């Protein structure tokens, strides 16, 4: 990324300096010295040379940088094409999801075991002799003196 920024900055500065000084000097010299430069080959050669300098100094480095940026952006487009090898953050997220699923499965198994145990245990009569249902019937499991109330 830093290399890309350096290439862009240097290309812009060099391209600006070339365009500013060479074009202005060429235009001024061609306007002032039209009578001196009568050879059309020199003018065409200067324009072609200027175009080649622009191409090699300004356009070519910036186009390669632009292509690199496009490739990086297309390879990091996670919404459309998720990476085949998840990143460290992705691994941590997947581990957390797996742990949550395991905890949910353990809780579900514990609930199922508790339900099975509650279904297999016999129902014990835990009513005391003074409840509304059994106030006239003594409870045989309690070994105390009980009185029947009428």
From Swiss-Prot:
The keyword Repeat is annotated on this UniProt entry: no
UniProt KW Transit peptide keyword: no
The entry's keywords: Membrane, Transmembrane, Transmembrane helix
GO cellular component, one term: membrane
Entry superkingdom: Eukaryota
UniProt membrane topology term: Multi-pass membrane protein
Major subcellular site: membrane
Subcellular location: Membrane
Segments crossing the lipid bilayer: 4-24, 42-62
Name the record gives this protein: Putative transmembrane protein DDB_G0277665
Protein source organism: Dictyostelium discoideum
